[in-house]
Amino acid sequence: MNTFGDNFRVTTWGESHGKALGAVIDGCPANLPISEQDIQNELNRRRPGYSIFSTPRKEEDKVEILSGIFEGKTTGTPISGLVFNKGQKSKDYSKIKDTPRPGHADLNYFLKYGNYDYRGGGRSSGRTTIGNVIGGAVAKKLIEFTHNIKIIGYSTKIGKIKGDFDYYKNPKFFESDSNIEKLLKKIENNPLRCPSKNSDEMKDYVIDAMDKKDSVGGIIEIIIKGIPQGVGNPVFNKLEGKLGSAFIGINAVKGFEIGRGFEASELYGSEMNDAYHIYENSIKEMTNNAGGIIGGISTGSPVVLRVSIKPTPSISKIQDSMNLISNKDEKIEIGGRHDPIIVPRVIPVLESMAAITVADLMISSGYINPCRI
């Protein structure tokens, strides 16, 4: 439905062209230092207008916290935050309200519910991820404050152009906090949030698609660094199962893999297995091909995840569809303001869902006191 999590729960609400969107976070312990600006900083990363490759829709996305935070700290009660929509242009959709847009949820929503908000996709719009990011901002703060866990997201592939930077090209890079700080700055200073040296080639690829009135997708890598051993459970409450559920809940996501992922099918067992050794009186893995999770439980190594993002379905090209009133085939030309690539703006959303998942399981696994910090 609209709530994710068991102990740390985030409920999102709102539609693309409604009055407002937001989230209610229940289960955050008291005494967590956090400000409205902390949440705003994360929303700014998701906000439209981030780069030349994002929608020209103008939105301030200013968050208002209504409850749950007092004198700069959480109170342990539900945290409620909202963002008012200000830049919606619903008239852009009035001409196509009876013609389902290919690649969107319009037709499925109509067939299932009968009555749905067609403006900008309503509840199925990417804009509804504002609620995810509000919840994720709180979760990020919680896991970093209590266990210094950091979540780093970046694009590794745009369309058919593969980047030259990812975790497995240099795993030791992520052992250094200074390296990570430099990486984060590099990511945020790139319009595609891509740290690869060939990111200019990726930019040209997107521009070419824009010139053709088309769109492109890509692959995002998410690294969770600092998560302790023992987070997650066997069988139906696995860490990777929860992360997969969190990510697949985002409409743009079409694929998900952990560690070596599908590449593991090509390896010998001797190549895939992460051997152990004793280092400074602790058991350490010599490699991290499993991606930080074995048996549904975190190993203590960085969790390595990759997510496939589909091309933005709203494109300016004329497409085939049908009319729900006349029940006849019809051409559709989508107006409005849309992202030629959604990948860079999905990154903070994926980071948010990863943080919510980790916070939830760390509370259930006993790593975080559910009452107070």
Curated annotation (Swiss-Prot):
Enzyme Commission number(s): 4.2.3.5
Keywords for this protein: Amino-acid biosynthesis, Aromatic amino acid biosynthesis, FAD, Flavoprotein, FMN, Lyase, NADP
GO cellular component terms given for this protein: cytosol
MF terms in GO: chorismate synthase activity; FMN binding
Cofactors required: FMNH2
Keyword Ligase applies: no
The family this protein is said to belong to: Belongs to the chorismate synthase family.
Protein name (record): Chorismate synthase
Species for this entry: Methanococcus maripaludis (strain C7 / ATCC BAA-1331)
